[in-house]
Amino acid sequence: MPIFSNNTGSDAVAGSMTAPEPATATTGRGSNAGKGSGQSESVVRSAGVVSMAVLMSRVTGLLRESVMARLFGAGLIYDAFMLGFRIPNLTRDLFAEGALSSAFVPTFTDYLANRGKEAAARLANLVATALILVVGVVCALGVIFAPQLVHLMAPGFAAVPGKFELAVRMTRTMFPFLLLVALAAQAMGVLNASNKFGVPALASTFFNLGSVGFGVVLGIWLGPSLHLTRIEGMAIGVVLGGALQLVWQLPLLYRLGFRFRAAFDWQHPGLVRIFRLMVPAILGNAAVQINVMVNTNFASTIVDPVRGMDGPVSWLSYAFRFMQLPLGLFGVAMASATLPSISRSAAAGNMDEFRRTLSKSLGMVFLLTVPSSVGLAVLGKSIIGAIYQGGRFQLYDTQQTSVALSFYAIGLAGYAALKVLNPAFYALDDARTPMLVSLGSIGVNFATAEIMIRAAGMGHAGLALSTSVVALFGFLLLFEILRRRIGGIHGRDLARGIGKVLLASLVMAGATALSSHGVERWLGVSQLARLADLVISIPVGLLVFYGMCRALGVDEVDMAISAFTRPVSRRFRRKTSL
């Protein structure tokens, strides 16, 4: 039975596959260079589309966190809420931006290109059915064993009256979010494999808006009549926001002809291949999130001289949330746009094109994330103060969160590069190597965190630094393994470009620091002064960085600007022409 309905016509599906077919990528050595270059630029353009959508997602995510900060501050209630959200949120990062997409997209692309759209659609239905069954069971187990999970992740919560019990309630309330986000991740994979990037990238925006909107309605407006506390309403809002994230993608799937039909065939070779890639990929792609969980365990036991045991978990969470803005904007966007292209190259056996595309993607990641990390470190206090401070989020919270943000920023480039490198291994049908590196990095993180807290006495800042060290460790090790396996990744050109970006970023750091210091002396440290600092210092830093890149011959900077502004300008021209 066809699953891609003929109602839309075969051209509707074929027309969406605008990237070069695998067969055309090997039509002669002489043409490959041009096509490889074209594919690399196509990846950057696709990343631009994704990045604009991801920008909206991250901005609305910050809006959600800002509302939470003002309502609950950084303390017992938000610590418990964040722990309850962390388990399904970990799964979101693994599925939506990692393991499922990395395992499903190459397999689905292979079926779509070599076996036809009906075979590919049947595979998609098999995966969706399996997810409903498997993840549904996991959700049930999570609700039952919530107390044990909370104790495992945050043993220090039991020392604060009421904190452990609230965290258990939050965990049980938000666990169904896991199933919704798993299905949303698969829908994202189908659309990305069909070269539809904007709609799935916007899905997280609808989650953010839905979670805060439903949460405010249920927790504040209707809370008294429904006998819900504010934090309980926000927890239910998370689940409803997850449902909205899935529903947003369904119309485009329908227009492509996709119809869900329950299908059972556990021996299907495509499903077996996906699970074979996915199980180790969960570990191989989970280093950052697992290390955050390890750090949560450590953070729950830290005694702050001012706040006691309430605060460190919240400070780390708020800081890491802001870190996700450039990470999602650049790292996840490049990974989402790169994976289908390198999957086609790997399926066609065209390793020259594979190397070119991967090198271009990594170079673009460093071009965008290195200056971002410098900006986060230099302007951390102004960023956190302008966005979070107010209500129950006090000046002391701003100071402690900005310290964590500065140390997280050290590993930003490593975080983002891992988003591109891990899928490259999966495209080569190798999930074992990232898994082993990830397991090793978890041990490195545990040892580093022990040193930072016990020996150095750095508190929550040491935990942020240990996470960054692990991200850089994982990137360097995976890069070297992949370089040897595929015979190079244009390493000299890549290193030369990164060196230029580092130099430009250092000059930018000096200019931004001078600007920020001048604004502080002029206006002080009020929230208005923080906003003024960002309005003045960010453009100064960007202009200096752009000028240095042009002076050093970093031509990719113009390509990046074009890629990330074209979607907006095209939409603006379309509206003005109406």
Question: Could you tell me what each predicted segment is?
Answer:
Residues P2-L578:
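Membrane-embedded alpha-helical bundles of multi-pass transporters/translocases
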